Amino acid sequence: MLDNYFKYKQHKTDFKTEVVAGVSTFLTMAYIMFLNPVILSDGGFDFGGVFTATACATALACFIAAFYAKTWPVGLAPGMGINAFIAYGVCLGMNYTPEEALGAVLVAGVVFLIVSLTPIRAWLINSIPKSLKLGIGAGIGLFLALIGFEIMGLTADNPVTLVQLGDLSNPLLLLGAGAFISMIVMEKKGIKGNIIIGIIAFSIIAWITGYGQFNGVVGEVPSMSYLFKFDLGAALSASMVTVVFTLFFIDFFDTAGTLTSVANVSGKIGR
């Protein structure tokens, strides 16, 4: 039955290969479940609620992609660029509440869905040069890298130059640099789940050396605190138009750039 639906033989694969690929993809994406709540909690979101929402949304999106796309599925999860914009730009920078930000995300998502189901999607994507599609993803990656460097302590705020070199003697910076380098080495060696392995390994080192705090294996009961907790009225106000447009812009072009990159690597451009 699965072979008939997913066409394993036609695509020269089998159930075992797909299971291994699925586990490898999970290990590659698992860090998002931890990083997304960390970033959004800086903007006032509840860590437990975001963790639960991230896990549920990712699972649902992957199931839909698997059964709808069939032979061309991709792993779907919250974007690591758009969450940083919400936390640091919308909530901290513009002083919106998490509920108002969630309302803006909902409206932007509805607009994204409408555009995706109409010819507008193809027109917009085909109008963008391939170099720009790839460049958008790279730009968002650099934005995230800058945030990561600041959290590590490698960079710091400067009132004149905006960014300056941090304290290189900070032990937390050395731990962060070690984790980053280890992830790159594992990536080059083709080790699956390099990001989550690096996070776990250096978290343990931080706990042992006293620079981290271990709160147990099981934290708290999954929280559904953000289920339908969006402020739609605020999201539809005139003051939120730029926020909604920016969220849609980031989401649409980040998706276009990512899918273009994945399709280019897998040889499925134009399919």
Q: Which residues make up each language-model segment?
A:
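Hydrophobic mid-bilayer segments of alpha-helices in multi-pass membrane transport proteins
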Residues: 80, 105-107, 136, 140, ...
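Flexible hinge motifs at transmembrane-helix junctions and intramembrane kinks/re-entrant loops
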Residues: 181-223, 248-252
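Helix-loop-helix junctions that connect adjacent transmembrane segments
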Residues: 156-173, 208-249
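Membrane-embedded helical hairpins/re-entrant loop segments and their flanking transmembrane helices
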Residues: 11, 40-56, 245-271
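Transmembrane alpha-helix interface/packing and boundary motifs in multi-pass membrane proteins
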Residues: 60-74, 184-187, 246-254
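Early transmembrane hairpin of solute transport permeases
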Residues: 20-169
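N-terminal membrane topogenic signal
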Residues: 10-23
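Short, Lys/Arg-rich, polar N-terminal cytosolic tail immediately upstream
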Residues: 1-13
